[in-house]
């Protein structure tokens, strides 16, 4: 709301100036990039909401999960922007690059969740053991585990999203009003992020769950990419076809990835059966049944972390 209000106030104060006719033709693609990058901002922060909930089971607490996701997210944005900033003025097909970056970020974000498995825990344990073997503290070893999870799930998509920022600036910023145009790009992207966070946190995740929400975000990202290469001018045929291919793979992956993918990776689920699983605004709750016959017991997971169970030791401890 603050970003929208500031933008409205700035527009009210802007005086109309005489503009040559040729600027009228150039304005349409600029506004298109502005709106597309605004929607991309919603998708990007929607990813952060999903990641903050889905990565918890590979860490110990939600506080650590949020901090690590945010740090990795910002690092990816920084590196992506820095890597492409020096080359963006030499791009001959900025619309094609923009479309591929946004669509590719959506596909990779979904692919990384779809490919999650036992390998991530093994990689975390191996990295922690290596750090401890060097004489590091247990805190550093635990931090290494968290970093491996964040790099495996969050890092690559955010690098692509960060790289899209200088391309969006090139498409949206004119030479006559650099400050105003840059402000518009940041304001619209921020506004899109606000809407994306609210929709994902309060509507999509409770309604669709984490995996399906991530799939929908990937499809929206593919739609942004397709719109960019379809409506933008000077797009190379190969990049247009590449965005279409990325979109088709994203749709297929969104439909084929199991809804309980994250639940199946809970530590207790590997040696038991999933009795209950629900995702909502506050987090995820799962009940896993382990053991057989009279020795069967149930374990409660909140946000992917085992909290208690109905085995005798747990009943005595949690009484």
Which sequence ranges carry the predicted segments?
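Alpha-helical transmembrane segments of multi-pass membrane proteins
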Residues: 1-319
């Amino acid at each position: 709301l603050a970003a929208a209000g500031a933008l409205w106030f700035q527009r009210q104060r802007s005086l109309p100036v005489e503009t040559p006719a040729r600027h009228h033709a150039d304005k349409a693609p600029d506004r298109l990039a502005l709106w597309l990058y605004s929607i991309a901002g919603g998708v990007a922060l929607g990813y952060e909401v999903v990641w903050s909930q889905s990565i918890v089971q590979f860490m110990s607490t939600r506080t650590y999960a949020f901090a690590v996701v945010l740090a990795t997210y910002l690092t990816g944005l920084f590196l992506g922007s820095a890597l492409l900033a020096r080359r963006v003025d030499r791009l001959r097909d900025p619309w094609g690059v923009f479309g591929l970056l946004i669509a590719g970020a959506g596909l990779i974000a979904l692919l990384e969740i779809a490919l999650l498995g036992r390998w991530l825990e093994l990689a975390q344990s191996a990295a922690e053991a290596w750090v401890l073997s060097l004489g590091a503290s247990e805190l550093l070893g635990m931090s290494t585990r968290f970093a491996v999870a964040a790099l495996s799930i969050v890092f690559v998509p955010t690098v692509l999203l960060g790289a899209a920022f200088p391309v969006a600036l090139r498409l949206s910023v004119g030479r006559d009003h650099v400050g105003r145009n840059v402000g518009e790009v940041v304001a619209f992207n921020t506004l899109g992020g606000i809407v994306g966070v609210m929709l994902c946190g309060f509507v999509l995740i409770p309604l669709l769950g984490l995996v399906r929400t991530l799939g929908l975000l990937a499809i929206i990202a593919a739609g942004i990419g397709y719109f960019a290469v379809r409506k933008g001018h000077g797009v190379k045929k190969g990049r247009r076809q590449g965005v279409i291919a990325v979109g088709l793979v994203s749709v297929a992956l969104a439909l084929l990835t199991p809804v309980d993918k994250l639940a199946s990776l809970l530590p207790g689920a590997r040696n038991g059966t999933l009795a209950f699983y629900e995702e909502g605004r506050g987090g995820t709750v799962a009940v896993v049944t382990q053991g057989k016959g009279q020795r069967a017991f149930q374990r409660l997971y909140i946000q992917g972390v085992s909290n208690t169970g109905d085995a005798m030791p747990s009943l005595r401890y949690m009484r």
